[in-house]
Amino acid sequence: SGFIAVHPEDPNIVYSGAVGSSPGGNGALQRYDHRTRQIQMINVWPEESTGFAPKDLKYRFAWTFPVVFSPHDSNTIYAGGNHLFRSHNEGQSWQAISPDLSRNRSEKLGLSGGALTVDSAGAEQYATLSTFVESPHRSGELWAGTDDGLLHVSRDGGSHWRKVTPKALPEWSYIGAVEISAHNADIIYLSATRYKLDDYDPYLYRSQDGGKTWQSINGNF
């Protein structure tokens, strides 16, 4: 399971960002070629995470993490950990283009598991990006949401970032999706959930001014 990204100019090349779908450890990222039926591991930062607390790792990646091609450049692909990463050469090298965009609260990043043994599978890594999109209208306008309830935008390809989280969105919400209207570059949609915190209300927002203000569009959900 996980995010996939199909190469815009070659549908035989597929990228998958999912720790549980392959070997490769923390941040396992695959490049699969249907012609040769070969998989190449192109992890952003190959690092053994077994038995380590997430706070002690250089970078954190969720069990499934965003992998997205730029709509403006088929040679550019993004991957989301606690930072946003970018590659211009099909994942052979990566560059961090953001600071840590999560809350990065150390008390939330310890070892998980029970009293006798700890979970060492790498599944319990939080404070990471849960969704990412580059504006189809404006090259370099990057929107990133996290699993701990923060939304950031960069309008210069990652050089500078601004927090634009809806003020009414409760803390620790899981931002599941950020989408930009196909008809208007300044209309942004956001969906979030808090069911893991025993909150089953829907959280749907729309901004009509590029993230400056947000309105709830829950309606009668």
Residue ranges and their predicted role:
Residues 1-221:
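Beta-propeller blade termini and top-face loops
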